[in-house]
């Protein structure tokens, strides 16, 4: 029997008076990779922020590893092994690549460390070549690699990637997808948001589509490939 790492039920989340999430149920099992899809403004990032405690839901419940974390601060969610790579990246530009990674390791969960400093550098050879570069000296793609590398240094059980390849050149985007495959093979659960549904569904086990803050589809990648009308209807592709 699989272990449910995230179990969110009946989420209603608002920005001021704007009702964004409308009764969303969302779950993540151990070792599962999930694609979260939807057009712009449909609630994807809001759902991720609700899971992380950044934008607490007004109604509903978020359970992490069986513990009720609804409305708890993000650092408490992170301590339970959930790492969040937000859209727009989040590195310390005045610190070197090495310092960024070392700092993340100190903030990570205790116990066995599957993702060591050496393993991260092996996975991200570009970062290994730029250890003494400041974060602000890196390209957009390298900054994204550093952000993901920092998250892995915390040794998470769940990795959340919001707009994983947004604004990246095709060659760099392919490298990010390669890294996503490595992460999946390592056994980490992942939630991936990205506009490139073809790449997403090559990696994911299950996919969720949001429309106006409601779940309108949940199913396997194979189902989406077999029935393209679902993507056409809800994503316009």
What are these regions (language model features)?
Residues 37-39:
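The feature captures the beta-strand-to-loop junction immediately N-terminal to the Walker
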Residues 52:
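Helix-to-loop junction immediately C-terminal to a conserved catalytic motif
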Residues 56, 68-88, 113, 117, ...:
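ABC ATPase NBD coupling module
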Residues 134-138, 142:
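Conserved ABC ATPase signature
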Residues 151-152:
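ABC ATPase C-loop
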Residues 159-163:
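Catalytic Walker B motif of ABC-type/P-loop ATPase nucleotide-binding domains
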């Amino acid at each position: 029997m699989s272990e449910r790492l995230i179990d969110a039920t009946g989420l209603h989340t608002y920005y001021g008076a704007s009702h964004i999430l409308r009764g969303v149920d969302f779950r993540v099992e151990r070792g599962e990779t999930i694609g979260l899809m939807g057009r712009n403004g449909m609630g994807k990032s809001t759902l991720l922020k609700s899971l992380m405690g950044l934008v607490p839901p007004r109604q509903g419940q978020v359970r992490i590893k069986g513990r009720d974390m609804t409305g708890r601060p993000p650092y408490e969610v992170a301590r339970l092994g959930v790492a969040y790579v937000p859209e727009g990246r989040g590195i310390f530009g005045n610190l070197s690549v090495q310092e960024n990674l070392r700092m993340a390791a100190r903030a990570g969960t205790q116990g066995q460390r599957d993702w060591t400093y050496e393993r991260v550098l092996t996975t991200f050879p570009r970062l290994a070549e730029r250890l003494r570069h400041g974060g602000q000296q890196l390209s957009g793609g390298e900054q994204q690699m550093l952000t993901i590398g920092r998250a892995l240094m915390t040794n998470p059980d769940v990795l959340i990637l919001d707009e994983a390849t947004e604004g990246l050149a095709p060659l760099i985007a392919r490298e990010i997808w390669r890294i996503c495959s490595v992460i999946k093979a390592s056994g980490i659960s992942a939630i991936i948001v990205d506009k490139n549904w073809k790449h997403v569904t090559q990696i994911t086990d299950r996919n969720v589509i949001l429309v106006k803050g409601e779940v309108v589809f949940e199913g396997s990648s194979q189902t989406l490939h077999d029935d393209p009308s679902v993507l056409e209807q809800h994503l316009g592709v």
